[in-house]
């Protein structure tokens, strides 16, 4: 019996059944398919999932025959199988599917007749067909007695898909398979001859054989071409030139406020992780990996989560002492509630406390205290009340809705939540803006707990820190680094003058924010309404499994990384990446030698620091050692039955891990990103750059792509992170990772003059009429500019050593131009206006468009290779250069 899944309204049927065989019918039927709901023959993927998934592997190359406008291909992708090609002989529906799923580049859509597929032999591991043969056989009079024409049609499809039956009785001494193979051999011989003729023509036209005609080169050339906008001059707007086509083909997916290369790769990585965790044959010798699966499965237990509703959080609030919003509360327990909320459950009301390397003595860890306590992304949302009235109203509505879901009454809940919001506004008033915190020498203050107590006496710091870092014994002389003494002093005064009931409501509100993502769908729906106002997202269609992968990554990221690395990471990639870093470092150091503004003593120290930068590629070694991996998560209890309790256990466990670090030196094995993360970073206290396995893939890096693209992709990322060691903050740390003045005054003054040019340049850029903050983004802008220059110089050095490489076919770009296009296309991006505003006020990076335009307009090499004249939009005539 057919499984009846959700589907679109039944469309107009053909006059006769045989009409199903005609492409004209399908072209007419699929007019407007890009905007209509999928139509599922026999049912959707969920109806067949139990049958299919045991037969599929994550890296299978899957072909879907007669895809129509079904969501099957996309659902297979979401199921953890990223390599899916779909064919249909209606060009109308193929165009619609390309548009609908343009945000998923691994899904391919081709116009083909299933009776005459155009793929090379061996192109696929799995072929799926759901209703296509039925459509082809609608002309049959009797379903039990198929005509010879019908048999021939089925034969054609099976043959094209790679299946044949033996019929030796009909064909005498030779089986049909043998005859087919003989025919295929003749066909391949003809194709080979045709290829040789074509190549001969190509070689005749291109005597130097300078064009790369490998499959990889042809594929990447196609992707580059479809991303370009040839209607725009590269000297007018290089971002639009490089990304205009990509932007047209990539409308924002539902539920997303932004979409770019990083999001796309993370979705692919998540699909792989899903398959690994849901594999019915999952069997690991590592307890940490087993915990990872249990945690993930507990997150998927939606029925259990819905059944519990808000009760787990209500019970937790009662255990802590109650909440004035929802019922009785203990009025004399400020310190006890603070210890529970900020200590046991790791929320961050008023301030945040953590253990990390001491910036001025990087071989030892120390307690650190910094400003915190705001729920909205930035203080600007609270203080610019006229511009952000919609957001503040939506936030108050959200606060009220959660309070009522937890047992509050409508009138009293809104009033009490309004008081909490007013307290957050007062916190925003004393919070120091990020662009005023860039000089770490100025904001670093080391003191004892006794001195901290004198600075901020509204709470007992020794009691709080001793509870947080239990079982360690702390005394009044224990050193603490405070970032922002003025802030803490004012917070203390704010606590003293605030009503106890408001303080209690604010503290418990911080706990509620921390834990509601582990509760039922009502809390999720409330958050979605706030996010729609804050980021402009439409209602999220994010599958539950994706949410659970992200949660698992947060909780057990390195155990998850162990599974990811073993399934996907090629050790050769690590060796190649290390070689590229060496080349880029050499190019950076060579450029150091040509800087006219830097004195010799500072230059030598800078070279020594560059030499000392430690690079970490792929993953930390301990994750592949089961015992070492298990030790990392020893003490973290994970059950498959209670997602909420797993999250509480995680907060408590992380507090214990933090306490354990205080008396130990910092470890290089302690990464700040998990291996599956699509990103990279520089850490000044270790003077190290880290490139997780997740980013070492296309479009950043592919071993069989032209070097121009690899240097323009991952090469610029490497140069970017290396340059962070010498941006306005990184340059304050020496080669050992210690915050100390090591620059000569004259060079420091010259550096500041050069960075002032960058700051002023980027401050002129606007998004939707709102200016960028050139001070806030200064470090990232310096790194973008320096990274591009170092990577391009490294590419030129590679060419000098290895000679010119072949060019890509059809793109019409030299390899030097291709380097810059490759760099720009990494940053192709779309986002909502609300998300763009949020980025401007919170993100230390410039918007993607200006990461391209700002950087390239300062590049002499770019301007030369594209011939941009002075006075053109890409060449103002004034270049800002630091490194």
From Swiss-Prot:
Cofactor-binding details, from the entry: Binds 1 zinc ion per subunit.
Any one GO CC term of the record: Golgi membrane
Cofactor: Zn(2+)
Sugar-modified residues: 279, 283, 324, 384, 429, 496, 652, 745, 753
Key words, A-Z: Cytoplasmic vesicle, Disulfide bond, Glycoprotein, Golgi apparatus, Hydrolase, Membrane, Metal-binding, Metalloprotease, Methyltransferase, Multifunctional enzyme, Phosphoprotein, Protease, Signal-anchor, Transferase, Transmembrane, Transmembrane helix, Zinc
Signal sequence interval, chain numbering: none
Broad class of the protein's primary localization: Golgi
GO biological process: brain development; cardioblast differentiation; heart development; methylation; peptide hormone processing; protein processing
Binding-site list for Zn(2+): 720, 724, 780
Annotated spans, Methyltransferase-like region: 1-160
One Pfam assignment: Peptidase_M13_N
InterPro entries assigned: MetalloPept_cat_dom_sf, Methyltransf_25, Peptidase_M13, Peptidase_M13_C, Peptidase_M13_dom_2, Peptidase_M13_N, SAM-dependent_MTases_sf
UniProt-listed SUPFAM superfamilies: Metalloproteases ('zincins'), catalytic domain (SSF55486), S-adenosyl-L-methionine-dependent methyltransferases (SSF53335)
Stretches in topological domain Cytoplasmic: 1-178
Transmembrane regions listed in the UniProt entry: 179-199
Regulation: Inhibited by phosphoramidon.
UniProt cross-references to PANTHER family, sorted A to Z: EEF1AKMT4-ECE2 READTHROUGH TRANSCRIPT PROTEIN-RELATED, ZINC METALLOPROTEASE FAMILY M13 NEPRILYSIN-RELATED
Role of this protein: Converts big endothelin-1 to endothelin-1. May also have methyltransferase activity.
Family of the protein in this entry: In the N-terminal section; belongs to the methyltransferase superfamily.
UniProt protein name: EEF1AKMT4-ECE2 readthrough transcript protein
Species this chain originates from: Bos taurus
Gene (UniProt): EEF1AKMT4-ECE2
């Amino acid at each position: 019996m057919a499984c009846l899944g959700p589907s679109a309204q039944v469309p107009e049927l053909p006059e006769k059944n045989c009409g199903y065989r005609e492409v004209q019918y399908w072209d007419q039927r699929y007019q407007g398919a890009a905007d209509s709901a999928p139509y599922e023959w026999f049912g959707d993927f969920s109806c067949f999932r139990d049958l299919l998934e045991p037969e599929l592997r994550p890296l299978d190359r899957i072909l879907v025959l007669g895809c129509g406008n079904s969501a099957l291909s996309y659902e297979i992708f979401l199921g953890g199988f990223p390599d899916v090609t779909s064919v249909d002989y209606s060009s109308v529906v193929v165009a619609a599917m390309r548009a609908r799923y343009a945000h998923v580049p691994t899904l391919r859509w081709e116009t083909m007749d299933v009776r005459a597929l155009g793929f090379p032999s061996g192109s696929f591991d799995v072929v799926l067909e759901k209703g296509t043969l039925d459509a082809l056989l609608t002309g049959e009079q009797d379903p039990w007695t198929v005509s010879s024409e019908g048999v021939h049609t089925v034969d054609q499809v099976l043959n094209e898909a790679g299946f044949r039956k033996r019929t030796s009785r009909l064909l005498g001494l030779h089986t049909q398979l043998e005859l087919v193979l003989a025919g295929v051999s003749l066909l391949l011989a003809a194709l080979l001859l045709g290829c040789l003729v074509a190549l001969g023509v190509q070689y005749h036209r291109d005597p130097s054989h300078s064009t790369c005609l490998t499959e990889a080169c042809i594929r990447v050339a196609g992707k580059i071409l479809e991303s370009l906008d040839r209607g725009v001059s590269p000297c007018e707007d290089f971002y639009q030139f490089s990304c205009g086509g990509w932007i047209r083909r990539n409308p924002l997916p539902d539920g997303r406020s932004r979409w770019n290369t990083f999001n796309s790769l993370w979705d692919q990585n998540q699909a792989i992780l899903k398959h690994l965790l849901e594999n019915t044959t999952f069997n690991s010798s590592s307890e940490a990996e087993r915990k990872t699966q249990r945690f993930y499965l507990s997150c998927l237990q939606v029925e259990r989560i819905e059944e519990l509703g808000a009760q787990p959080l209500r019970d937790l609030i009662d255990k802590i002492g109650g909440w004035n919003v929802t019922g009785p509360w203990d009025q004399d327990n400020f310190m006890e509630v603070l210890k529970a909320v900020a200590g046991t459950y790791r929320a961050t009301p008023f301030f945040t406390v953590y253990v990390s390397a001491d910036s001025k003595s990087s071989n030892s860890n120390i307690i650190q205290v910094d400003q915190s306590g705001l729920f909205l992304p930035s203080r600007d949302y609270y203080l610019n009340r006229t511009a952000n009235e919609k957001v503040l109203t939506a936030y108050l509505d959200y606060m009220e809705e959660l309070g009522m879901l937890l047992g509050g009454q409508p009138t009293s809940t809104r009033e009490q939540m309004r008081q909490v919001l007013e307290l957050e506004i007062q916190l925003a008033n004393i919070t120091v803006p990020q662009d005023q915190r860039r000089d770490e020498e100025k904001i670093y203050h080391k003191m004892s707990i006794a001195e901290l107590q004198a600075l901020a006496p509204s709470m007992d710091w020794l009691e709080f820190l001793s509870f947080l870092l239990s079982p360690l014994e702390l005394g009044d002389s224990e050193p603490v680094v405070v970032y922002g003494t003025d802030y803490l002093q004012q917070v203390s005064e704010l606590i003293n003058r605030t009503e106890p009931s408001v303080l209690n409501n604010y503290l418990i509100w911080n706990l509620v924010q921390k834990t509601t993502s582990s509760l039922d769908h009502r809390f999720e729906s409330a958050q979605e309404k706030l996010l729609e106002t804050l980021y402009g997202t439409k209602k999220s269609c994010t599958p539950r499994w994706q949410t659970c992968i992200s949660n698992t990554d947060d909780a057990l990221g390195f155990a998850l990384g162990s599974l990811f690395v073993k399934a996907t990471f090629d050790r050769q990639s690590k060796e190649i990446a290390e070689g590229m870093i060496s080349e880029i470092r050499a190019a950076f150091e060579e450029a150091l030698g040509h800087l006219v503004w830097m004195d010799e003593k500072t230059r030598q120290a800078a070279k020594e620091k560059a030499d000392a930068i430690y690079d970490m590629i792929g993953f930390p070694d301990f994750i592949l050692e089961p015992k070492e991996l298990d030790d990392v998560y020893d003490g973290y209890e994970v059950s498959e039955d209670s997602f909420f309790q797993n999250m509480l256990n995680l907060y408590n466990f992380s507090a214990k891990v933090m306490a354990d670090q205080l008396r130990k030196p910092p470890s290089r094995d302690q990464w700040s990103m998990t291996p599956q993360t699509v990103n990279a970073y520089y850490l000044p206290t270790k003077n190290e750059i880290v490139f997780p396995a997740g980013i070492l893939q296309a479009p950043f890096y592919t071993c069989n792509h032209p070097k121009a693209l690899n240097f323009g992709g991952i090469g610029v990322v490497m140069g970017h992170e290396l340059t962070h060691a010498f941006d306005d903050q990184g340059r304050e740390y020496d080669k050992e990772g210690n915050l100390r003045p090591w620059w000569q005054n004259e060079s420091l003054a010259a550096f500041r003059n050069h960075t002032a040019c960058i700051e002023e340049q980027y401050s002129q850029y606007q998004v939707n009429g709102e200016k960028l903050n050139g001070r806030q983004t200064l470090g990232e802008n310096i790194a973008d500019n320096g990274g591009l220059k170092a990577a391009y110089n490294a590419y030129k050095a590679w060419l000098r050593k290895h000679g010119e490489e072949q060019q890509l076919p059809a793109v019409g770009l030299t390899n030097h131009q291709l380097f810059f296009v490759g760099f720009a296309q990494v940053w192709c991006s779309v986002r909502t206006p609300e998300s763009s505003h949020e980025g401007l006020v919170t993100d230390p990076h410039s918007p993607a468009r200006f990461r391209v335009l700002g950087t390239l307009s300062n590049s002499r090499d770019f301007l030369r290779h594209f011939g941009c004249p002075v006075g053109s939009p890409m060449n103002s005539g004034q270049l800002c250069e630091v490194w």
